[in-house]
């Protein structure tokens, strides 16, 4: 399931904001929204994986895919100056107050209502959030999506796209039924039912 930036098209239009493709444009859009009384970015960071997604994009766009993979494999320490540069970019969003207030007390789902009711304009999130946006009344007319913008020119635009998988443990005591269960889960009709809840492809 891919990640990126979901945004309120109508709020962007009302404030004369075009979809940002560079970091400077993104930060400028945040400043315009903040000045208009709109929280630029909603987030729920009660469970920290949501902030990991933001970090991943900042690092991928600042240092590139190969660096990011080496960092996450432990081959490069988080004390590396290039990682400091990532947090410097994050500071450009945190210090001016571009994230939702009190986000540390909210789960990711609880950060969706501010965007639905127009208090916030963007959410860096996966496509599983779309079902909740639409349940809240947003439509394709006012809900848009854009690629996280470029930070370091020339670095290829790698994407955040986790994959959820299910496996049988090597030491499982009932591998026969576990295999039957995985076969059941892989049926098209079961996948269709699961995806009604998960909101994923």
Predicted regions: what is each one?
Residues 23-28, 101-116:
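Short helix-initiation/N-cap motifs at beta->coil->alpha
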Residues 1-19, 27, 38, 45-71, ...:
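Periplasmic solute-binding protein
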Residues 30-32, 73-104, 148:
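Glycine-centered hinge/linker elements that transmit conformational signals in sensory
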Residues 11-12, 31-35, 109-123:
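Short helices/loops that flank or line small-molecule/ion binding pockets
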């Amino acid at each position: 399931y891919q990640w990126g930036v979901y945004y309120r098209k109508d709020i962007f239009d009302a404030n004369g904001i075009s979809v940002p493709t560079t970091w400077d444009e993104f930060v400028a859009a945040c400043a315009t929204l903040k000045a208009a009384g709109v929280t630029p970015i909603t987030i729920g960071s009660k469970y920290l994986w949501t902030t990991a997604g933001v970090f991943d994009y900042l690092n991928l766009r600042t240092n590139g895919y190969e660096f990011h993979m080496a960092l996450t494999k432990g081959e490069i320490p988080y004390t590396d100056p290039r990682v400091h540069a990532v947090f410097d970019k994050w500071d450009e969003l945190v210090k001016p107050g571009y994230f939702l207030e009190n986000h540390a007390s909210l789960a990711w789902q609880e950060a969706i209502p501010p965007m639905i009711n127009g208090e916030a304009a963007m959410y860096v999130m996966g496509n599983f959030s779309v079902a909740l946006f639409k349940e809240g009344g947003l439509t394709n007319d006012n809900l848009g999506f854009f690629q996280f913008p470029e930070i370091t020119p020339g670095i290829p635009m790698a994407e955040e796209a986790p994959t959820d998988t299910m496996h049988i443990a090597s030491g499982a005591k009932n591998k026969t039924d576990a295999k039957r269960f995985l076969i059941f889960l892989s049926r098209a009709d079961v996948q269709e039912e699961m995806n009604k809840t998960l909101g994923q492809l």
